[in-house]
Structure formats: C-alpha cells, structure tokens
C-alpha cells in the first residue's frame, strides 16, 4: 500500500478531535459545480467573540485529460492566490504544483513549487518556498511496510543556512487501529491512538509533552454515528475543557453542525463557547 504523506500521519486521530466542532464561530460553506465542471467553494466565518467576519472564494477547474488542476483563491484580507497542479503525467505517482499568492494592499508576493511522489511503500515530498530573504526548502519522506510507518520531515532555511525543522515519526496502522508517535526538534514529544471500535463508534487519544517545562497535554475524544444522517462527538482534555458536537444531514447536500465548549473548572463563570456551522452542496 502507498503510505500517507508526513502531514497525514496520525490524521485519523486528529480528525476525531477536530471535525464536527467550530467553537466561537458561525460558519457557512457553500459548494457548487457548474455544467462545465468548474467547482466553486464559498466560505464565510463570523467570530462571536471579536465580531470579525472572514470570507473566501475558491474556483477550481480540472482538466482530466492532461492531469491538470487550476485553482484561483481570494479572501477578505484581499489576498489573491493561483495554483496550478499536474499529476500522473510526467511519471505515475508524481504531482507537481506551482502556488503563488499576491496581496495588492501590501504588495507582498510569495511563491511555492511543490513536488510529491508516491509509490508502493514510499511517499516523498519536497517544497521550495521562495522568499525575499532566500528560499526555504521543506522535505519529507515516509516509508511503510506491512502496516509499519516511519517518517522524517525537515526545513532548511537558506537565509540562515541551517535546519529550522527536524521531525521524526513512527507509526503502526491497520484497518481499525492506528498508533502514531513523533518527536519535533528533539524537544516536543507527541503520540496518538485511533481505534474504530465498531461501525458506528470511533475513539482517539492524544498525548503531548515538551521538554523543559514538564507540561503534559492529554486528551480523549469519541465520535458516535447515531444513524446515516446524524453523529455526535465529544472530547475532553487535561485542562478540563469539554467539547461536544452534533452533526445532522438535514437533506442531501445540507449539513448542520452545532458545537459547544465548556470550561469544566469554571462552569459558573461563563466564557463557554457555542458554534454553528452550515454546509450547502449542490
């Protein structure tokens, strides 16, 4: 089997902790597709604490015959982005991406060239991030064999001529169980466990520890599928923050998400957060 990219190691556990929640936000996502195959994604978010509203628009066109994908992005910070990707054309398993952003307000520009190559037992990635000070090179590699996974990730800053990121990861993955551990820059240690208990129930545990301050972070989360249209999620961490979420598919293409974050140490003090999300797809 093809192993996941380094960024996707431990993703199943992270999804149980992150998906189905949107504390302190009112969010609307709309996805549509034109007759010519152009995909439009519009997103709007309002922060209930600050009152700040953010919006974004993305258009994507896939030219399947040539393995090309064109993406245009815009957000309310007035940042424009263009991405061109070509996959499985030069070589099978190879994806090349050219990504640029431009902010007319500040005149700031950025550019990235990304290369990803995946085959049986191996997943490689190399990104070059162009900056005025000098390019930064991000590299990653994951190898997998019979469920075992090992990965390495680095960033080399050419302006400083040194490694600014140096991460290792080891994991084990089966159909319904995943174990993942990683060490970041030799100082941050983390681990996660994901288990699909049944067709309806998924659980996850994560643990993180940073050397030097002896602070250990711990969390446990679960997701239960009530039926084909509804699911509930819950999570708690060692800071006594309790999160609950409810996701309901009202009808095909319409999904509602309700979530709440409760501070277990200060239940009567207020400061709890609510979230509302609506996804429309046509």
Swiss-Prot record:
CDD domains recorded: Porin3_VDAC
GO cellular component term, pick one: pore complex
PTM-bearing positions, type N-acetylalanine: 1
Site (Involved in hexokinase binding): 72
GO MF term (any one): voltage-gated monoatomic anion channel activity
Pfam families cross-referenced by the UniProt entry: Porin_3
Xref: Gene3D superfamilies: Porin
Domain of life: Eukaryota
BP GO terms, sorted: monoatomic anion transport
Transmembrane segments: 25-34, 38-46, 53-63, 68-75, 79-88, 94-103, 110-119, 122-129, 136-144, 149-157, 162-174, 177-184, 188-197, 201-210, 217-226, 230-237, 241-250, 253-262, 272-281
Presence of keyword Disulfide bond: no
Entry domain remark: Consists mainly of a membrane-spanning beta-barrel formed by 19 beta-strands.
PANTHER family to which the protein is assigned, alphabetical: VOLTAGE-DEPENDENT ANION-SELECTIVE CHANNEL, VOLTAGE-DEPENDENT ANION-SELECTIVE CHANNEL PROTEIN 2
Self-association state and partner proteins as the record states: Monomer, homodimer and higher order oligomers; formation of higher order structures is necessary for scramblase activity.
Protein name: Non-selective voltage-gated ion channel VDAC2
Underlying gene: vdac2
